Amino acid sequence: MAPKKSKSDAQSIGAKLALVIKSGKVVLGYRSTLKALRSGKAKLILISANTPPLRKSELEYYSMMSKTAVHHYTGTNIELGTACGKLFRCSTMAILDAGDSDILADQQQ
């Protein structure tokens, strides 16, 4: 059984996500994330909790094919967009370069 995510885990992901947005390279949106997965540029995929199941399974399939890590964000697409500092919803995002953040190292564990 997977360990439960606590509130501090969600807050730490949010803080690391803000650092990635500021210092790294990210791609927001479903179509752009699929493009990054197909080209092999994506290092980590974040999928919000209310992403439609068909899109979620397609993203998981492409990430499995490209050997990219997937993180299921516990919040909705509105919360993921807000965590990125955007004023719009974002159901999926791909991290191309983590910058100064250690979000990729945490996902390896």
Swiss-Prot record:
Gene Ontology molecular function terms on file: pre-mRNA 5'-splice site binding; RNA binding; structural constituent of ribosome
GO BP terms in the entry: negative regulation of mRNA splicing, via spliceosome; rRNA processing
Keyword entries, A-Z: Cytoplasm, Ribonucleoprotein, Ribosomal protein
Main location: cytoplasm
Pfam families, per the entry: Ribosomal_L7Ae
Cytoplasm listed as a keyword: yes
Subcellular locations according to the entry: Cytoplasm
Taxonomic superkingdom: Eukaryota
One GO cellular component, as annotated: cytosolic large ribosomal subunit
SUPFAM superfamilies, sorted: L30e-like
Classification via InterPro entries: Ribosomal_eL30, Ribosomal_eL30-like, Ribosomal_eL30-like_sf, Ribosomal_eL30_CS, Ribosomal_eL8/eL30/eS12/Gad45
Task of the protein: Component of the ribosome, a large ribonucleoprotein complex responsible for the synthesis of proteins in the cell. The small ribosomal subunit (SSU) binds messenger RNAs (mRNAs) and translates the encoded message by selecting cognate aminoacyl-transfer RNA (tRNA) molecules. The large subunit (LSU) contains the ribosomal catalytic site termed the peptidyl transferase center (PTC), which catalyzes the formation of peptide bonds, thereby polymerizing the amino acids delivered by tRNAs into a polypeptide chain.
NCBIfam families for this protein: PRK01018.1
Family designation: Belongs to the eukaryotic ribosomal protein eL30 family.
Quaternary assembly: Component of the large ribosomal subunit (LSU). Mature N.crassa ribosomes consist of a small (40S) and a large (60S) subunit. The 40S small subunit contains 1 molecule of ribosomal RNA (18S rRNA) and at least 32 different proteins. The large 60S subunit contains 3 rRNA molecules (26S, 5.8S and 5S rRNA) and at least 42 different proteins.
Name under which the protein is recorded: Large ribosomal subunit protein eL30
Species assigned in the record: Neurospora crassa (strain ATCC 24698 / 74-OR23-1A / CBS 708.71 / DSM 1257 / FGSC 987)
Gene name, Swiss-Prot/TrEMBL: rpl-30
